[in-house]
Amino acid sequence: MADNYIERQYEAYQARKAAWEKERKYKKKKPTAPAETPHRSGAFLQNQVKKVVAVHDLSGVGHVSLMAVIPVLSSMGFQVCPLPTAVLSAHTQYPTYSFLDLTDEMKRIIENWEKMNVHFDTFYTGYLGSPQQAQIVEEFILKFRGENDMVVVDPVLGDNGHLYKGITEEMVTEMKKLIHLADVITPNLTELYYLLDMPYQEHITDAELKQALKTLSDRGPAIVIATSV
């Protein structure tokens, strides 16, 4: 049965996607009221292009985070709505970098989006600069998420058996809470072990990996994709 685990998870995702598309088509068939004079209200700003809110940092050097996410998702036809967590001169794997914390600005952006009545089809989270930011994102998802909206979490914590600079054990704890809300998570091998409270192993068998994926999936996310394996 373990051999079919990933296939079953993919089938579950496809079923969810089909139901979502059916719901969208049904809504499009509903009669609409006569068009009103355009105005800059939340209702007017809504459109049929699927919106993805990307919660990530902006790094000046190193083509990562929002610098990579925005062009890729835009080329796929999505409207990418950045919720920046920090502005860095370079990503944290460089020996030196500046760091501008945007925690307070995140709150203001979310409050403004709520006033605008903005709807997001997908929530994608990446680098979070502090445990407090993880809590803000969790509250944001719980408040804005619709029944058919998707949550994708890239649990950025570390690599090669170690946490990234600036990432603490408290952050690991908050990330464990955040993945409970996710439909899909994409941890690398290091992050997989941290989320499971298991000692890091550089080499892992297929059977061990499948068991780890299943254990993590049982904690919330329907689909767990292990990267860097």
Give residue spans per PLM region.
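Pocket-edge positions in alpha/beta enzyme catalytic cores
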Residues: 5, 98-101, 201
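Conserved phosphate/ATP/ADP-binding segment of small-molecule kinases
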Residues: 166-229
